[in-house]
A protein has these predicted regions:
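Rossmann-like dinucleotide-binding domain for NAD(H)/NADP(H)
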Residues: 223, 230-327
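Rossmann-fold NAD(P) dinucleotide-binding segment
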Residues: 48-57, 73-75, 207-226
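N-terminal glycine-/charge-rich "phosphate-binding" loop or analogous flexible N-terminal tail
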Residues: 1-41, 161
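Short glycine-/small-residue-rich Rossmann-like dinucleotide-binding loops
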Residues: 47, 66, 166, 202-204, ...
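Alpha-helix C-terminal capping/helix-to-coil transition sites in glycosyltransferase folds
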Residues: 37-38, 57, 193-194, 219-222, ...
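Phosphate/diphosphate ligand-binding glycine-rich loop within oxidoreductases
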Residues: 40-117, 131
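Oxidoreductase and adenylate-handling cofactor-binding alpha/beta cores
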Residues: 95-114, 156-160, 302-315
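Rossmann-like dinucleotide/phosphate-binding beta-alpha-beta segment
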Residues: 129-222
Length: 327
């Protein structure tokens, strides 16, 4: 039987055409504003109730990016029999951004760049020890999914001693072979003091929101660096701002935030947080762009096609989301 798939998007027809070419003959893709009469699979990141109830044949929702938005989780609570799947096409680009933010923060690239653009060499002589040597330092990676695993491998190659945390370490028996000391989230309280570099690759769920607060930051070594490519609210923004201001943290590289523009008109003047992180010289700011890149959309289409083809073959567990966990 043909799998009927509906993607209610009108933009980027070239990408949809790429997807169409990769689909097997038993997948029928409908896209645009007009839904088909029958729909087995809906592709939408933030579906509304009308979309979820339009077809009595709907079996699955595919979220075409990593993670599950909190608003979508709330909506799906009323659809307990609906399977949910998502994609991890952006794992490489997000991990690369995490490492870039770590290096830029640890090496204080931006303040020195700004000074030399003004022909000012003084910081080189006045602050010669400003850079953190990462080789031999201890890194703590929160989250050991597709992104966290890539981050851990690169950190290991840079000479850091890597500890990572996840809910089910038993599912990753090869972590030790990759040079990663993988621990359970139950052990996290004992690990903050070992985090010269803290890298966050966690989704936002009720269990992770506010996970890194004032107490956790105070237990980290003095002048540690923090990188967040997961979700902003995993870190308490007030505690983070204070730790950066008083020097407890040496710096932070942040790609994910607390406040986003709600429409195109707001994109030129929306503060990303309730605190002025942009005034701090020890912060590297990125506007939630870790998942982007020149080849990422092509990878999205390739992975989406692979998932839809798997669903058409009856592989209903492919990239399935556990909504009780939030990922």
């Amino acid at each position: 039987m043909t799998l009927s798939v509906y993607w209610p998007r009108d933009e980027y027809p070239e990408a949809v055409e790429v997807l169409q070419r990769r689909l097997s003959s038993d997948v029928q893709l409908h896209w645009g504003s007009a839904p088909p009469d029958r729909c087995d699979v809906l592709i939408a990141g933030r579906p509304d109730r009308d979309q979820l109830t339009a077809s009595p044949d709907l079996q699955a929702l595919v979220i075409p990016f990593a993670g599950v938005p909190m608003s979508t989780r709330a909506t799906l609570a009323d659809f307990p029999d609906l399977r949910v799947h998502n994609l991890h096409h952006n794992a490489a680009s997000t991990a690369e951004m995490a490492v870039a933010l770590l290096l830029a923060t640890a090496k204080r690239l931006l303040p020195f760049d700004r000074a030399l653009r003004a022909d000012d060499w003084r910081p080189r002589y006045e602050d010669f020890t400003a850079s953190m040597l990462l080789d031999g330092k201890r890194a703590l990676v929160l989250g050991y999914g597709a992104i966290g695993q890539r981050i851990a491998r690169v950190l290991n190659a840079l000479g850091l001693r890597v500890t990572a945390v996840c809910r089910h370490p038993e599912r990753h028996p090869d972590a030790a072979d990759a040079g990663v000391d993988l621990r359970s989230t139950r052990e996290l309280d004992d690990l903050w003091a070992q985090a010269d570099a803290l890298l966050i690759a966690l989704p936002q769920t009720p269990a992770t929101e506010g996970l890194v607060g004032a107490s956790e930051l105070q237990r980290m070594p003095d002048h540690a660096v923090l990188v967040n490519v997961g979700r902003g609210p995993v870190v308490d923004q007030a505690a983070l701002y204070e730790a950066l201001c008083d020097g407890k943290l040496g710096g932070a590289g942040i790609d994910v935030w607390y406040n986003y523009p709600s429409d195109p008109e707001e994109r030129a003047n929306t503060p990303p947080a309730a605190y002025p992180f942009g005034e701090l010289a020890n912060v590297v700011m990125s506007p939630h762009r870790a998942g982007g890149g020149d080849a990422v959309e092509a990878r999205r289409m390739a992975e989406l096609a692979e998932l839809l083809n798997a669903l058409a073959r009856g592989q209903t567990e492919a990239q399935r989301v556990d909504l009780s966990a939030g990922y």
